[in-house]
Amino acid sequence: MEKELNIDWANLSFGYIPTDYNVRCTYKNGEWGEIEVSSSELIPMHMAASCLHYGQEAFEGLKAFRGKDGQVRVFRMDENAKRIQRSAEGIMMPALPVEKFMEMVKMVVRLNARFIPPYGSGASLYIRPLEIGMSAQVGVKPATEYLFVIFVTPVGPYFKGGFKTTPYVITRKYDRAAPLGTGTFKVGGNYAASLRASCEAHAAGYSAEFYLDAREKKYMDECGAANFFGIKDNTYITPLSTSILPSITNKSLMQLAEDMGIKVERRQIPEDELTTLEEAGACGTAAVISPIERIDDPENNRSYVISKDGKPGPLSTKLYNRLRGIQLGEEEDVHNWNTIIEL
């Protein structure tokens, strides 16, 4: 008999809560096997597994939402399937077929349906796929065996304060990724490389660190673990860079901006251009949009105040509400981004 859940849905943090099941698929002898269901939170692993030594690990993040109509929707999972394929291929791992990825997502959501937060709680079911190199070896080369796992956990809003502006800080001491390195892939090493800068930013009272381009330290690159966008003159501007992870949320916001008659530009954004922005935000799966109050540059003793009244800008708010409305079934999904999971 299932144990009754004792979860305060309205006050969930963005953290890990154990659920009932995860799903797994093994790659060996040159092919993917059958999908397996597991109730264990542990992965048996050899101490010489390539993921532990040589960083053969890629992951994704997506969400399932219980909508206004009671239906469960997963947002743009085909895009996550394709992105983890690119990440895997970028570090010489086999790509899981899109169809198998989507089957695994549907399966794990159904198996853990009781953990999907209720509509109106502000919470969602976070879905974490990951692929890791499993074969034991000493020597830098791709593994021969891999494990693909998807687990889920209910999460609250990434930022407890909700949709409000927060400060960011430019760091020049660190680069998140090299211009032609692994920055465009969602691999663990990129996040390990950002931990020191992130911890220093948080300790100084900032929401996240802001990286400049690694080559010239002149252009805005990525803010923490999220993409950056600025708005001015009815134009949505986001960096074009070879070291930034292509955000599915940012891609969606660009489409919604065009739908609203807002011009979209993907180009380099010089730091000096921050003085002209009317609105700015960080965007990603976790927070959707985190509006930026100001961006400090302590090394040059400068502060770029984006939000003069301390509130999110009108277009950022409109884009946020539109995207959230689509995810929750409150607004028409004209681009067919959602997959409805039959429970």
Model-derived segments and spans:
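Helix-start/capping segments and mature chain N-termini
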Residues: 1-108, 137-343
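Intrinsically disordered, low-complexity linker/loop segments enriched in Gly/Pro
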Residues: 111, 133-134
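Short, charge-rich binding segments
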Residues: 114-120, 140-142
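Extended, Lys/Arg-enriched charged tracts that mediate electrostatic binding to polyanionic substrates
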Residues: 117-128, 132
